[in-house]
């Protein structure tokens, strides 16, 4: 059937005298390029022979130069041309291929990550060097210990605020919003990239409890966006929004992969924290780029002689034959449950700190004027508490985060029955056993102090994350449980034939994964831990603890990233709660807004102005008439404002005055003499044609798509927006304000005294050919505008979306949430057999979900559910009335948006 159709099409084309061309539709149904082109050539040739047409290669040179037929030529010139064309296409296509893009992205991010780690290590070593060099003078040592991080944090905050304030914070909440379809201006630009990299390096080099993973997701996304712009020079495929979204999803995985050298965990973590629904076709992009980036990152460490070979970032040496006993599983479960409560408390504390600072208006205004004072004070407080000769000796204050993790993951036991073992521990491990305290007290103080310090430090307006501080706190908590188990079982766990000692380092690994998973609401932290440590021996305890921690934390608080989204008031859609069966009984008709801002197809400009005053939304519904409410499409607010501005523009008013002057100066023929009174002039002005196109004869022309119009419409709109602003002041104030301001009132009062003089000037200008422009009094302008507002609207001069997203009133809340999450829409119209009855936005959906989640165990019936029974009884009558609306519909012409190809793409 397909072959017959193709042959018939080729025959018809040949019969009409058209040049032979390849059938693109048929090409998608065959294997291989050569077979495909040969088949198309054979079918066209058969059609030509059957109809007796001329041979194409004996025709014009253009026919012989057809690309599809060049390879059948025998001349050397044709073969050279074929080779050059193929080489050009190969180079362009290969440079634009995904794997080239992903290799470049992974390489750049690995270089950035390694360079930042090197700079951070140098900064931390400088702080330690100054502290050790001044150990003879405690005051100078304290000043050096405190001043160094204060200077770095202050520089980071100031540099970020000056160059790009969008670089502040983690970046994962914003990327989650961007991947959902929201556009954040100046968030993926080059200056934001520079501010993020330099600011993050200074912030982490200060030694504050800040993280790197979240900002690196943002850095990788910016790198992908900039790389897409560069590669768009070779091929336009990267200019498409869908392709950019796919590359951003892969970039999020690269950010985690090159940060921890954990490609598998990076891909899974990026999916969990940024996506609700993930396209599986992007899986290979994320894994390929993350793996390549992690490989280059570790190769650079070997090249710099930091490592002997490619190994894990925090290599451990746990027992592989018997890593844990069955009797230890309850302890691992306790770690998971406690980490769940701890993660929820961390998110709550972080949010409360921000809310308290915002509610204190006096402090907030003072700190807003002194933007660098808050980060300096917080850094001063934390540095003072971590000063090693002072209180910092009881919380291992002299250790960096990397050194802390290395000591916490140590597989040797630090204590036996509460006392330090006589073992040759590394110098870093000695920091956990100060002279006047034991390991337990040091770990408890470390956990408590680092907990609130990390929650406070992550609120500093610098590029920073919270994953690494939480990871360290969880490792310390797990180490505390492990050391407690080692003290309770000093001889180890007895089995049938042997005894196995407790490994506290394994408990630290479990605690780190559990607390990090509880704060971020992810399970992939378990995989990240396996790749960080290089061992998978504790896979079962880690998975048990992470799952339990997630179960507890998700029932108490949102994730840290969702909490930041709410704090920053970004558009978000909360997840449906667990075990809330009443949300399946809530329908769209229970939560929708019934008073929908709309405009009718036959409305006037006055109706448009009223619709703009009623709502601040971005879209307005377009209906057939206020009686039928048949939804025809949606129109953007900017389009409506452009229509009103063009209708009341000074250029249009000058055009009417010029017509009026020509009518006054033209000699009367078979008509009465032109009136000279003021009222007659106003009558003539009001009776001029006031259609939007400016000419009376254009009102009956067929409607034209907005994207195919000539420059005349855009020129008139530009003149209307860039004309004389002083003469348009009254029009704009009457359009957007209920009453004129005091300055306008005083100007009107002053102009009343010279109205007669202005009217005389108008009459003189009407009788003179040398005056280029006539003037109108404010009263005449207002009267003219009132007349213009009563004119019908011609929607052919604006872009209309003929297929806005729609729902039916019986759609469940669960299904609506799934649709909004999957498609990334922010509003949907509710229709009943084509009739507009309501609208649902993210605000209504969010309120409904949060209301069902926070219900106090009582199954409350939806507020409008009581009307369903009565509505069901009258459904037949309602259906009959709605069907009756389709009969007497007036045949209005509805303009379409864009070209037919655009609408076809939308249908697909």
From Swiss-Prot:
Residues 172-179, 247-259, 263-271, 505-519, 520-521, 522-533, 534-538 dip into the membrane without crossing it. Disruption phenotype: Develop progressive vacuolation between myelin sheaths at the white matter and the spinal cord, inflammation associated with disruption of blood-brain barrier, blindness and disfunctional nerve conduction velocity in the central auditory system. Other neurological functions including motor learning and coordination remain normal. Has normal excitatory synaptic transmission, but display increased GABAergic inhibition. Not prone to epilepsy. Hyperpolarization-activated chloride currents are absent in glomerulosa cells of knockout mice. A motif (Basolateral membrane sorting) lies at residues 822-823. Residues 592-650, 800-860 form the CBS domain. The gene is Clcn2. The keyword Phosphoprotein applies. CDD domains: CBS_pair_voltage-gated_CLC_euk_bac, ClC_1_like. Belongs to the chloride channel (TC 2.A.49) family. ClC-2/CLCN2 subfamily. It comes from Mus musculus (Mouse). Phosphorylated. Activated by dephosphorylation. This is Chloride channel protein 2. Residues 44-57 are annotated as: Modulates channel gating by both voltage and cell volume.
């Amino acid at each position: 059937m397909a072959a017959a159709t193709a042959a018939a099409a080729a025959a018809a084309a040949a019969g009409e005298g058209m040049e032979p061309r390849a059938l693109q539709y048929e090409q998608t149904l065959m294997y291989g390029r050569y077979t495909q082109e040969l088949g198309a050539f054979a079918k066209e040739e058969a059609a030509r022979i059957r109809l007796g047409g001329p041979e194409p290669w004996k025709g014009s040179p253009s026919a012989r130069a057809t690309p599809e037929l060049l390879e059948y030529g025998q001349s050397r010139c044709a073969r050279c041309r074929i080779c050059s064309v193929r080489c050009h296409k190969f180079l362009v296509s290969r440079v634009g291929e995904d794997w080239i893009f992903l290799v470049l992205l992974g390489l750049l991010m690995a270089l950035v990550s390694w360079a930042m780690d090197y700079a951070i290590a140098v900064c931390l070593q400088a702080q330690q060097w100054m502290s050790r060099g001044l150990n003879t003078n405690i005051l100078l040592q304290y000043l050096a210990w405190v001043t160094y991080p204060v200077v770095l944090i202050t520089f980071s905050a100031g540099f970020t605020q000056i160059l790009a304030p969008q670089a502040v914070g983690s970046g994962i909440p914003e990327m989650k919003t961007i991947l959902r379809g929201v556009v954040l201006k100046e968030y993926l630009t080059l200056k934001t990239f520079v501010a993020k990299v330099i600011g993050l390096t200074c912030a982490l080099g200060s030694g504050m409890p800040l993280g790197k993973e979240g900002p690196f997701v943002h850095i990788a996304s910016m790198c992908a966006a900039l790389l897409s712009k560069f590669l768009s020079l070779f091929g336009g495929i990267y200019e498409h929004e869908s392709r950019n979204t796919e590359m951003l999803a892969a970039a999020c995985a690269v950010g985690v992969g090159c940060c921890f050298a954990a490609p598998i965990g990076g891909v899974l973590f990026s999916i969990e924290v940024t996506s609700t629904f993930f396209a599986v076709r992007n899986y290979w992009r994320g894994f390929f780029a993350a793996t390549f980036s992690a490989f280059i990152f570790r190769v650079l460490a070997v090249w710099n002689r930091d490592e002997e070979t490619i190994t894990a970032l925090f290599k451990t040496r746990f027992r592989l034959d018997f890593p844990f006993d069955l009797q230890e599983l309850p302890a691992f479960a306790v770690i998971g449950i406690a980490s769940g409560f701890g993660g929820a408390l961390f998110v709550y504390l972080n949010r409360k700190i921000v809310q308290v600072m915002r509610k204190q208006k006096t402090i907030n205004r003072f700190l807003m004027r002194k933007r660098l004072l808050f980060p300096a004070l917080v850094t001063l407080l934390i540095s003072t508490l971590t000063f090693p000769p002072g209180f910092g000796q009881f919380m291992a204050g002299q250790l960096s985060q990397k050194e802390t993790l290395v000591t916490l993951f140590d597989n040797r036991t630090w204590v036996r029955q509460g006392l330090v073992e006589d073992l040759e521990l590394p110098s870093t491990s000695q920091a956990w056993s100060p002279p006047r305290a034991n390991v337990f007290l040091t770990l408890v103080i470390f956990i408590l102090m680092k907990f609130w310090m990390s929650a406070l430090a992550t609120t500093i307006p610098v590029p920073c994350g919270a994953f690494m501080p939480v990871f360290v706190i969880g490792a310390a908590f797990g180490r505390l449980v492990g050391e407690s188990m080692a003290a309770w079982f000093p001889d180890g766990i007895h089995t049938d034939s042997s005894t196995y000692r407790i490994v506290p380092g394994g408990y630290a690994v479990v605690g780190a994964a559990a607390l990090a998973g509880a704060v971020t609401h992810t399970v992939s932290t378990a995989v990240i831990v396996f790749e960080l440590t290089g061992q998978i021996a504790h896979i079962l305890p880690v998975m048990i603890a992470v799952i339990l921690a997630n179960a507890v934390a998700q029932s108490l608080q949102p994730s840290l990233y969702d909490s930041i989204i709410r704090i920053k008031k970004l558009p978000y859609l909360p997840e449906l709660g667990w075990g809330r069966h009443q949300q399946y009984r809530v329908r769209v008709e229970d939560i929708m807004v019934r008073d929908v801002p709309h405009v009718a197809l036959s409305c006037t400009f006055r109706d448009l102005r009223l619709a703009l005053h009623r709502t601040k939304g971005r879209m307005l519904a377009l209906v057939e008439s206020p009686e039928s409410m048949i939804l025809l499409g949606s129109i953007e607010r900017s389009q409506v404002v452009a229509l009103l501005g063009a209708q009341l523009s000074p250029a249009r008013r000058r055009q009417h005055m010029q017509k009026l002057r020509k009518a006054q100066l033209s000699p009367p023929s078979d008509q009465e003499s032109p009136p000279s009174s003021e009222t007659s002039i106003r009558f003539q002005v009001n009776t001029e044609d006031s259609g939007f196109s400016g000419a009376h004869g254009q009102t009956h022309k067929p409607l034209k798509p907005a994207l195919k119009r000539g420059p005349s419409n855009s020129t008139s709109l530009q003149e209307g927006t860039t004309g004389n602003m002083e003469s348009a002041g009254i029009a704009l104030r009457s359009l957007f304000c209920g009453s004129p301001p005091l300055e306008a009132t005083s100007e009107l009062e002053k102009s009343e005294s010279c109205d007669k003089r202005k009217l005389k000037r108008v009459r003189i200008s009407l009788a003179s050919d040398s005056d280029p422009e006539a003037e109108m009094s404010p009263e005449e302008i207002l009267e003219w505008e009132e007349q213009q507002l009563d004119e019908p609207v011609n929607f052919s001069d604006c872009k209309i979306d003929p297929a806005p997203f729609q729902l039916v009133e019986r759609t469940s809340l669960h299904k609506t949430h799934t649709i909004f999450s999957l498609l990334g829409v922010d509003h949907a119209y509710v229709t009943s057999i084509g009739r507009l009855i309501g609208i649902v936005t993210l605000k209504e959906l969010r309120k409904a979900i949060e209301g069902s989640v926070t219900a106090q165990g009582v199954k409350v019936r939806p507020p409008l559910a009581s009307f369903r029974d009565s509505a069901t009884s009258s459904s037949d009558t309602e259906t009959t009335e709605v069907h009756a609306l389709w009969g007497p519909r007036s045949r209005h012409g509805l303009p379409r948006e864009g070209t037919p190809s655009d609408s076809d793409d939308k249908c697909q």
